[in-house]
Amino acid sequence: MSNFAIILAAGKGTRMKSDLPKVLHKVAGISMLEHVFRSVGAIQPEKTVTVVGHKAELVEEVLAGQTEFVTQSEQLGTGHAVMMTEPILEGLSGHTLVIAGDTPLITGESLKNLIDFHINHKNVATILTAETDNPFGYGRIVRNDNAEVLRIVEQKDATDFEKQIKEINTGTYVFDNERLFEALKNINTNNAQGEYYITDVIGIFRETGEKVGAYTLKDFDESLGVNDRVALATAESVMRRRINHKHMVNGVSFVNPEATYIDIDVEIAPEVQIEANVTLKGQTKIGAETVLTNGTYVVDSTIGAGAVITNSMIEESSVADGVTVGPYAHIRPNSSLGAQVHIGNFVEVKGSSIGENTKAGHLTYIGNCEVGSNVNFGAGTITVNYDGKNKYKTVIGDNVFVGSNSTIIAPVELGDNSLVGAGSTITKDVPADAIAIGRSRQINKDEYATRLPHHPKNQ
């Protein structure tokens, strides 16, 4: 039989105090909704339907082309949300997973186990449960003396006795699809919230003598539903521990994993060394035996093998094997550094390609440049690429030497093997093998200093 999935993502998330729909808040680099969608993929659903509501267009944009959408214009409870999927799923034979889009810690393995449990026990409904010493706020699982599930009771509707139950409802279920939509026609809003509860379906199945089961999570963390910023931070912390643990198992060394922040889609090769306070975001890839020191921040970039990045920022760029960057360097978007390049302290590279073995040791700005191999930039070199309205390109050939404190005003080209004298301002192309000196000739005025009031003769 087929599997189907319903993801509930219509809520506003008032307690988040945000204009962004709750399910779009990020955990480890991607939205909570994307985490849930990826985990749902473990059951290989034939159809996935996402229920949207508040700012539906933003939610649909995240999963565009990956799921069908239905709109819950008025949020009248979880049961009502599932009713919205009726035009797509009613009458189909199979098993339907219902899951909230604000549960980013649920794993695909647990959802697969839930489906298998449901099928193997021939249940009409199976509840994913968890156990906790602090069940306040959760729906409780009420069982009979034979440990069979009788019903789920919400916190506001629970008796004092029921509030003591430690087994809680995680808000994730599997149903026989056909029976689910039949039962939904019989639920009502006679409860403290005045809403249609999906949990009332469980009571209907019990009344008709149908089999209802519960599969208990091994890890309570997976049950976390994020309703505010506190829970969001908790989810971030748990996810970060999972991610770092995975990388350590795969051969990556962490000095302090609790102070290292790695997004879920980052790829890291074995033998990489990561110091504390390193952040790796987005689609970043790190090659083998690279060292990332304290304070390094990398976004959507590829770093090759054997590189050393020291307390620097790299954004949307590529760094080849054996490159050294930093400390305090900034590689801005759309830059590429060839093999064995050295970018030293207080150097900024922006929108530039730099050939192998080129060095910019300190206090240099390289913007909108095409730089060849074996180039040396002296301290204080500035490429001037902006005239207040337009940006221009500088082309520097192979084996060029740029003396310290030089200013290169684009558009300009420095030919292969050329040399720029220290302190020069370059405004014209420099031919290959030429020396360019663009500064005033030094003039010494003998004895002139004796006329100045601060000279010792005038004290």
UniProtKB/Swiss-Prot annotation:
Its EC number is 2.7.7.23, 2.3.1.157. It catalyses: alpha-D-glucosamine 1-phosphate + acetyl-CoA = N-acetyl-alpha-D-glucosamine 1-phosphate + CoA + H(+); N-acetyl-alpha-D-glucosamine 1-phosphate + UTP + H(+) = UDP-N-acetyl-alpha-D-glucosamine + diphosphate. It comes from the Bacteria. The active site is at 362 (proton acceptor). PROSITE patterns: HEXAPEP_TRANSFERASES. Residues 251-459 are annotated as: N-acetyltransferase. Residues 230-250 are annotated as: Linker. Homotrimer. This is Bifunctional protein GlmU. It comes from Streptococcus pneumoniae (strain 70585).
